[in-house]
Curated annotation (Swiss-Prot):
GO terms for molecular function: ceramide 1-phosphate binding; ceramide 1-phosphate transfer activity; phospholipid binding. Its main location: cytoplasm. One of its GO terms (biological process) is negative regulation of interleukin-1 beta production. Mediates the intracellular transfer of ceramide-1-phosphate (C1P) between organelle membranes and the cell membrane. Required for normal structure of the Golgi stacks. Can bind phosphoceramides with a variety of aliphatic chains, but has a preference for lipids with saturated C16:0 or monounsaturated C18:1 aliphatic chains, and is inefficient with phosphoceramides containing lignoceryl (C24:0). Plays a role in the regulation of the cellular levels of ceramide-1-phosphate, and thereby contributes to the regulation of phospholipase PLA2G4A activity and the release of arachidonic acid. An N-acylsphingoid base 1-phosphate binds at D53, K57, R103, R107, H147. One of its GO terms (cellular component) is endosome membrane. It is a peripheral membrane protein. It catalyses: N-(hexadecanoyl)-sphing-4-enine-1-phosphate(in) = N-(hexadecanoyl)-sphing-4-enine-1-phosphate(out); N-(9Z-octadecenoyl)-sphing-4-enine-1-phosphate(in) = N-(9Z-octadecenoyl)-sphing-4-enine-1-phosphate(out). It comes from Danio rerio (Zebrafish). This is Ceramide-1-phosphate transfer protein. The keyword Phosphoprotein does not apply. It is found in: Cytoplasm, Cytosol; Golgi apparatus, trans-Golgi network membrane; Cell membrane; Endosome membrane. Belongs to the GLTP family. The gene is cptp. Pfam families: GLTP.
Length: 211
């Protein structure tokens, strides 16, 4: 049986993912995402359409990391440099590198923004706040921009089945409401920093719209 979700481990993994010079270690980025998958799975099947895709993307990156060219995949920065210099990224249309590290991580990057926005809404929510609304608003600001209409429609329906705010606080395994809010307050700035570093790197290299 998998370990229960731990918000503390999210904090630790994303903190570990940042080097002194603000490069992002893929090993710890993946570890952070594995914790977030545990969070999604602890809420039942509502997020399965996202978590299954995330798991497959994590596996691709793990294969790169453990492969013969793994030394080029230590950080997101080294991966981008290596793949671009060796023409390993399909920049304008799907071609011979449909599962490049850059494309794979971009999908995780977009999903990370959604979770960051949702958890921030949860952190600042009140007793009468609806999780379905918070989650939908976060989705519409992020992932929805990259999904076709049918998926957006299905997602909207799925979010209607989200449990209440109390359940979300319970699955954090971080104590009472005050403790959960405090730990989210520590974790989310780290997630946001990792997101922004990646966003800036991808923007600089024109990688934000990879097919």
């Amino acid at each position: 049986m998998a370990d229960a979700f731990s918000l503390q481990r999210v904090l630790e993994t994303f903190r570990s993912s940042l080097s002194e010079n603000k490069e992002v270690y893929i090993k710890y980025y993946i570890a952070g995402w594995q914790e977030l998958v545990s969070f999604m799975n602890s809420l039942g099947n509502v997020f399965s359409f996202i978590s299954k895709d995330v798991v497959s993307k994590i596996q691709i990156l793990e294969n790169f990391l453990s492969g013969e060219n793994g030394s080029n995949y230590v950080t997101i920065q080294s991966m981008v440099k290596y793949e671009l210099e060796n023409d390993l990224v399909d920049l304008t249309k799907r071609g011979s590198h449909p599962e490049s590290g850059c494309r794979t991580l971009l999908r995780l990057h977009r999903a990370l923004r959604w979770l960051e926005l949702f958890l921030e809404r949860l952190r600042t929510s009140t007793e009468d706040s609806k999780t379905s609304v918070m989650c939908s608003d976060a989705y519409n600001e992020s992932l929805a921009n990259h999904h076709p209409w049918l998926i957006r429609k299905a997602v909207g329906v799925a979010f209607c089945a989200l449990p209440g705010r109390e359940t979300f606080f319970d699955v954090m395994n971080a104590g009472d409401h005050t403790q959960v809010v405090a730990l989210l307050g520590e974790s989310l700035p780290l997630i946001a920093e990792v997101y922004q570093i990646t966003e800036d790197l991808y923007a600089k290299n024109n990688l934000l719209e990879l097919p």
